[in-house]
Amino acid sequence: MTDKLSHEYTPGLHGHITHTELASIDPEATREWCAAVFPWTFQPPFQGPQGDYHLFAYSGQGGGGIRRTADGESPGSTPTVHVDDADVTYRAALLAGAESLAEPHDVMPGVRVAVVRAPGGVVIALSGPTA
């Protein structure tokens, strides 16, 4: 968890995809390419578990991040769905047949995240406010 960033919960977005995480073998090159092609605004990178994490915004209610792939991970993207309560939605997802990839945990002040694999193999992150 980082102390540098925080996030205030935005009510009314339950069920909306509000963040997309891009896993890249070369995050800096991906960032440069995205900045050249899309009208995204980037914040200065901060240190994450896989190295520099590059946050971007593309609207007042959406954005994402670019990070280095983990060992053995293929490049790709993970949509993050905004939820009212990450713990409650995580449990509901498991009861509905999802597989747990990461239990709910705080990633920064104000943000709690869990990750599941939905039936059919799709990976989806759930993001809600901290308690």
List where the protein language model places each region.
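Vicinal oxygen chelate
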Residues: 17-25, 70-94, 112-117
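Short acidic/glycine-enriched loop/turn segments that link adjacent beta-strands
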Residues: 48-52, 73-75, 107-112
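N-terminal beta-strand motif that seeds the catalytic metal site of vicinal oxygen chelate
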Residues: 1-31, 77-79, 127-131
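Conserved active-site tyrosine of GNAT-family acetyltransferases
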Residues: 30-34, 93, 121
